[in-house]
């Protein structure tokens, strides 16, 4: 499966002359892990949102195997994991309810991500950032997922948790031949986990 961005342009209201993303081109193939680095505020998160279909570009488009990403309904093969997991889960739902919305989660993923069963009966605020991020990863890694967009997903976590998560993701990506976009300020991380690195400047 191939995720492509062609002539991708995006600007916020009344900022047409200063687009945050300007005629950007990108291709990610199955099994490829692309690193993306660049200064804060440059538009890396916005790019991820465009690639996942959460935002509509002002010009250009995003295609998945030649089909516009926004045409996908239901479980999209492109999934995104965010830097701040607490912002993308409903604080009023227990984790088992949030997980149920994503469909069946493989027990193998729960085990590999060290997700404790008792966490399922807790609310998001009762978990640490690392624990909650593990849930978000399990939810994003449904069987249909072919491309995973990782936006600074371990930047706020301790070093041990970072290492555990990336070890798991590398193993999972290789096992499934899953494509990945890895956004990070850490060049050391990108060099370790990615097959190629691009600079967003």
Regions found by a protein language model. Name each.
Residues 1-5, 9-23:
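A short, flexible loop at the N-terminus of ABC-type nucleotide-binding domains that lies
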């Amino acid at each position: 499966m191939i995720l492509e961005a062609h002539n991708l342009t995006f600007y916020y209201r009344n900022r047409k002359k200063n687009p945050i993303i300007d005629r950007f081109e990108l291709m990610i193939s199955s099994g490829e892990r692309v690193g993306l680095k660049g200064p804060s505020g440059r538009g890396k998160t916005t790019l991820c949102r465009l690639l996942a279909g959460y935002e509509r570009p002002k010009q250009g488009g995003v295609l998945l195997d030649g089909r516009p990403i926004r045409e996908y309904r239901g479980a999209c093969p492109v999934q995104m994991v965010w830097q701040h997991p607490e912002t993308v889960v409903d604080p009023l739902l227990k984790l088992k309810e949030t997980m149920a919305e994503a469909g069946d989660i493989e027990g193998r993923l729960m085990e590999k991500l060290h997700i404790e069963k008792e966490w399922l009966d807790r609310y998001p605020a009762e978990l640490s950032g690392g624990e909650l991020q593990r849930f978000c990863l399990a939810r994003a890694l449904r069987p249909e997922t072919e491309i995973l967009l990782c936006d600074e997903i371990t930047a706020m976590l301790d070093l041990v948790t970072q290492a555990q998560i990336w070890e798991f993701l590398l193993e999972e990506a290789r096992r499934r031949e899953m494509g990945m976009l890895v956004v990070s300020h850490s060049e050391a991380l990108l060099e370790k986990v990615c097959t190629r690195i691009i600079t967003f400047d």
